[in-house]
From Swiss-Prot:
One of the record's GO cellular component terms: cytosol
Keyword Repressor set for record: no
Family classification: Belongs to the dethiobiotin synthetase family.
Gene: bioD
Record function comment: Catalyzes a mechanistically unusual reaction, the ATP-dependent insertion of CO2 between the N7 and N8 nitrogen atoms of 7,8-diaminopelargonic acid (DAPA, also called 7,8-diammoniononanoate) to form a ureido ring.
Name of protein: ATP-dependent dethiobiotin synthetase BioD
Record keyword Transport present: no
């Protein structure tokens, strides 16, 4: 029996399409014949519907997954205010416990062939006074997919984030160029620069370029990703 696959999705910043790309990957994995589930361990920003607190990012992931996890497993920490998690957690009397997230991930792996774990914000977002999302990624021990929001400044953001990931002993399984600014000048040259630097310094392949889609449909974006290459990388990482 093939061991389940998993990856940790992070980004160069907040609001650069990390959830959108995660949803696209979920669709891609499903098309690849895999049972794909999503974990959004920490979500900040909730709304109430029918007496249940929900999160838009988590909803988008559920819509893309062909294995939908129970909400309390998919998102063990749902915070109400849309702000920095450690600040909101302190105000709401919640402790963002990494061990709880690791346990949720372990359970999720028993229910799917591949589990996409989406982080919150960028790679180093505080969860407590002493731990951040980089510590979470290390505790999970997963290959990382880096989502780069292609806009002015993205080269430095991408290289710095990649350095931070590998400095923690983690492998970058690949990166995705997500074109968030359709009016950006020299977008092709920016992507080419990031591609060359990340390949040379981190052996991190470009998994795909996602055009600025309107409407933003994850199913369409899935066709722009090299899911087969990602699956091969994840399987090799298990050995």
């Amino acid at each position: 029996m093939t061991a389940p696959l998993s990856l940790f999705v992070t980004g160069t910043d907040t609001e650069i399409g990390k959830t959108f790309v995660s949803a696209a990957m979920l669709h891609g994995f499903a098309r690849h014949g895999l049972r794909a589930a999503a974990l959004k361990p920490v979500a900040a920003g909730a709304y109430e519907r029918d007496g249940v607190w929900r999160n838009e990012d988590a909803d988008q992931l559920d819509a893309a997954a062909n294995v939908v996890l129970p909400p309390e497993l998919r998102t063990p920490f749902l915070l109400k205010a849309p702000a920095a998690p450690h600040i909101v957690a302190a105000q709401e009397g919640v402790t963002l416990d990494i061990d709880t997230i690791v346990a949720s991930h372990r359970e999720a792996l028993t229910r799917a062939d591949v589990v996409v774990v989406e982080g919150v914000g960028g790679f180093r977002v505080p969860l407590t006074d002493t731990q951040d999302t980089a510590d979470l990624a290390v505790a999970l021990g997963l290959p990382v997919v880096l989502v780069v929001g292609v806009r002015l400044g993205c080269i430095s953001h991408a290289l710095l984030t990649a350095d931070a990931i590998t400095a923690r002993g983690l492998r970058i399984a690949g990166w995705v160029a997500n074109h968030v600014d359709p009016a950006m000048s020299y977008a092709d040259e920016n992507v080419a620069t990031i591609r060359d630097w990340l390949a040379r310094e981190h052996r991190a392949p470009l998994l795909g370029r996602i055009a600025h889609l309107r409407p933003a449909i994850p199913e369409s974006a899935a066709a722009m990703l090299d899911i087969a290459a990602l699956v091969d990388t994840l399987r090799r990482a298990q050995h």
